[in-house]
């Protein structure tokens, strides 16, 4: 597999942990597997659980980059034993009072949904230092 400078496998201590995405000033790793085995949870519960576990998920900009490089990201996930992006995933970005953005990987689009509805979560590790 040809690896480009934007999308590449990411390893920690020799173990594949996700896909690194480096675009402009964004540098992040999409986890190899869904958070909590892909359980669908309401947005506020998801954000609380991520906070408690010292984790995060896509911001809006990162979700846009994921959408742009969707096929390459899924190829790296599959080639290294990860799970493809194949669900609706919450982002950490609220749209308005009761709505938050989500990344619908089934249709490769970004939308928003009511916070009390349920979606899956895929964690992100930010590598960019402020």
Which residue ranges define each predicted feature?
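C-terminal, surface-exposed recognition/capping segments
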Residues: 60-130
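Extracellular adhesion/carbohydrate-recognition regions
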Residues: 1-55, 87-91, 98-102, 115-124, ...
């Amino acid at each position: 597999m040809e690896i480009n400078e934007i999308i590449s496998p990411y390893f920690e201590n020799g173990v594949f942990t996700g896909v690194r995405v480096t675009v402009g000033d964004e540098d992040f790793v999409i986890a190899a597997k869904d958070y909590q085995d892909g359980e669908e949870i309401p947005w506020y519960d998801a954000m609380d659980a991520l906070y408690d576990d010292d984790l995060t998920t896509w911001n809006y900009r990162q979700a846009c980059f994921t959408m742009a490089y969707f096929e390459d990201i899924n190829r790296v996930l599959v080639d290294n034993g990860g799970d493809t992006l194949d669900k609706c995933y919450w982002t950490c970005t609220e749209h308005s009072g009761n709505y938050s953005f989500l990344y619908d990987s089934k249709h490769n689009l970004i939308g928003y949904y009511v916070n009390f509805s349920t979606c899956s979560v895929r964690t992100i590790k930010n590598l960019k230092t402020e």
